[in-house]
């Protein structure tokens, strides 16, 4: 029996991957987390798609030309990238490395396809699936966004059930009903707190 010990917990920074179907509220949840000034580093995804009027360069996405995106691929400077609905999206490696080296937890928002790609490369990341309470609510959210063409809306609604089938590949699920963003934020912060109490920390290597 141990009667005397000296235990100093050494916390390792986490790489958190937040994903889920289009319209589930990923942007809204992370925006609320940013409002609270939580000690996290948020990685901005790079994309070739056109910027929406409501979006800000360097905040919502880094918007670049297709030729620039191809250059990042050739330099192996993207953690993952994919062609989604005809546009390229990618997660830059450099800011992740920099944040982890400072000891900061890192949050990356990607679609379900991107999360699967990252899991093959960094299996020790923490994978969180943001879930709608039901398909009816997800449909209403997508329709109310007013940013989707009818064809894009049909594609996203057809893809959502297939994405939800990937739920078992994730570590945690957070249900995000309309109007309950604060609860979703609390659950994500509880996940982060629990992960920092692991006996065997997750070691992230990029």
UniProtKB/Swiss-Prot annotation:
<protein>
    <recommendedName>
        <fullName>Guanylate kinase</fullName>
        <ecNumber>2.7.4.8</ecNumber>
    </recommendedName>
</protein>
<comment type="function">
    <text>Essential for recycling GMP and indirectly, cGMP.</text>
</comment>
<dbReference type="Pfam" id="PF00625">
    <property type="entry name" value="Guanylate_kin"/>
</dbReference>
<keyword id="KW-0418">Kinase</keyword>
<feature type="binding site">
    <location>
        <begin position="20"/>
        <end position="27"/>
    </location>
    <ligand>
        <name>ATP</name>
    </ligand>
</feature>
<dbReference type="InterPro" id="IPR027417">
    <property type="entry name" value="P-loop_NTPase"/>
</dbReference>
<keyword id="KW-0067">ATP-binding</keyword>
<comment type="similarity">
    <text>Belongs to the guanylate kinase family.</text>
</comment>
<dbReference type="InterPro" id="IPR008144">
    <property type="entry name" value="Guanylate_kin-like_dom"/>
</dbReference>
<dbReference type="InterPro" id="IPR008145">
    <property type="entry name" value="GK/Ca_channel_bsu"/>
</dbReference>
<dbReference type="GO" id="GO:0004385">
    <property type="term" value="F:guanylate kinase activity"/>
</dbReference>
<feature type="domain" description="Guanylate kinase-like">
    <location>
        <begin position="13"/>
        <end position="193"/>
    </location>
</feature>
<keyword id="KW-0547">Nucleotide-binding</keyword>
<dbReference type="GO" id="GO:0005829">
    <property type="term" value="C:cytosol"/>
</dbReference>
<keyword id="KW-0808">Transferase</keyword>
<dbReference type="GO" id="GO:0005524">
    <property type="term" value="F:ATP binding"/>
</dbReference>
<dbReference type="InterPro" id="IPR020590">
    <property type="entry name" value="Guanylate_kinase_CS"/>
</dbReference>
<dbReference type="InterPro" id="IPR017665">
    <property type="entry name" value="Guanylate_kinase"/>
</dbReference>
<keyword id="KW-0963">Cytoplasm</keyword>
């Amino acid at each position: 029996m141990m009667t005397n010990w000296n235990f100093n917990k050494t916390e390792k920074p986490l790489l958190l991957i937040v994903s889920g179907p289009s319209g589930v509220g990923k942007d809204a949840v992370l925006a609320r987390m940013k409002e609270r000034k939580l000690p996290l580093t948020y990685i901005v995804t790079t994309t070739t798609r056109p910027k929406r009027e409501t979006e800000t360069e360097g905040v919502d996405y880094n918007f670049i030309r297709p030729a620039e995106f191809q250059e990042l691929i050739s330099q192996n400077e993207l953690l993952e990238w994919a062609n989604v609905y005809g546009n390229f999206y990618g997660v830059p490696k450099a800011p992740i490395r920099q944040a982890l080296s400072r000891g900061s937890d890192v949050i990356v928002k990607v679609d379900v396809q991107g999360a699967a790609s990252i899991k093959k490369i960094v299996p020790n990341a923490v994978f969180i699936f943001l879930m709608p309470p039901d398909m009816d609510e997800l449909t209403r959210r997508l329709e109310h966004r007013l940013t989707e063409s009818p064809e894009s809306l049909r594609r996203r609604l057809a893809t959502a059930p297939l994405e939800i089938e990937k739920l078992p590949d994730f570590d945690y699920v957070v249900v995000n009903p309309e109007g309950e963003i604060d609860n979703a934020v609390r659950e994500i912060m509880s996940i982060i707190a629990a992960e920092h109490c692991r006996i065997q920390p997750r070691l992230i290597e990029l």
